[in-house]
């Protein structure tokens, strides 16, 4: 797993309180990891802070899974 993926996973585990094993590439933040809409906003803000990037609202709406987050961040850094 890449450094970016490791850092994203750490943020997801910390913010959602889920086991690392549940955070897979296709794991949906809402459907699989129990996040609500506020959690997803907080995740996006945490990703922005961790990686020093800005995620526009329209892009944030497309980040539904762990894999989506990693791909977006890899393209933004």
From Swiss-Prot:
Keyword Cytoplasm: yes
GO terms for cellular component: cytosol; membrane
Entry's Gene Ontology molecular function annotations: acyl binding; acyl carrier activity; phosphopantetheine binding
Domain Carrier: 2-77
Post-translational modification: 4'-phosphopantetheine is transferred from CoA to a specific serine of apo-ACP by AcpS. This modification is essential for activity because fatty acids are bound in thioester linkage to the sulfhydryl of the prosthetic group.
Cell location: Cytoplasm
GO biological process, one term: lipid A biosynthetic process
SUPFAM superfamilies attached to this UniProt entry: ACP-like
Pathway of action: Lipid metabolism; fatty acid biosynthesis
Keyword vocabulary terms for this entry: Cytoplasm, Fatty acid biosynthesis, Fatty acid metabolism, Lipid biosynthesis, Lipid metabolism, Phosphopantetheine, Phosphoprotein
Modified residues (O-(pantetheine 4'-phosphoryl)serine): 37
Statement: the UniProt record of this protein carries the keyword Iron-sulfur: no
SMART domains in alphabetical order: PKS_PP
HAMAP family in the cross-refs: Acyl_carrier (MF_01217)
Record function comment: Carrier of the growing fatty acid chain in fatty acid biosynthesis.
Family label: Belongs to the acyl carrier protein (ACP) family.
Name under which the protein is recorded: Acyl carrier protein
Species of provenance: Paracoccus denitrificans (strain Pd 1222)
